[in-house]
Amino acid sequence: MPGLFSANNLIKSRKAKRLADTAYRKRALGTKYKHSVLGRAPQAKAIVLEKIGVEAKQPNSAIRKAVRCQLIATGKKITAFVPYDGSVTYIESNDEVTVEGFGKKGRSVGDIPGIRFKVCKVQNVSLHAIFTGKKEKPSR
């Protein structure tokens, strides 16, 4: 049991030990936003460079469709997953796409290795709306 006048010492030791916690350190120092490709933004616009197929991790066997694109704001190149079956056909090279995060805490999802973003819009039209046939992709 700590002594009567040991509150200050307890506070000091708590602060020191708290810095060992990685989750706390990320929150306190704000490194989540410093090292994020999107910065503080939830979404970003990008130009498609090429379409690629990413092999799924074991035990699954599939080629997940993705696009390599360059962010307009920062100029950084990222890989973004294209959701919905066959919707990669709606995306061509040099199209403008909107990308957003694709997992918890900025990490990749499931059996798709190293892909932290997904495509949500093509030429400012929702990819889901194009996929379901509700809207058409505008021509340039």
From Swiss-Prot:
Any one annotated GO CC term: small ribosomal subunit
PTM-bearing positions, type Hydroxyproline: P59
GO-annotated molecular function: structural constituent of ribosome
GO biological process: translation
Pfam family for this entry, one: Ribosom_S12_S23
Keywords: Hydroxylation, Ribonucleoprotein, Ribosomal protein
Stored InterPro entries: NA-bd_OB-fold, Ribosomal_uS12, Ribosomal_uS12_euk/arc
Keyword field contains Cytoplasm: no
Family membership: Belongs to the universal ribosomal protein uS12 family.
Name of this chain's protein: Small ribosomal subunit protein uS12
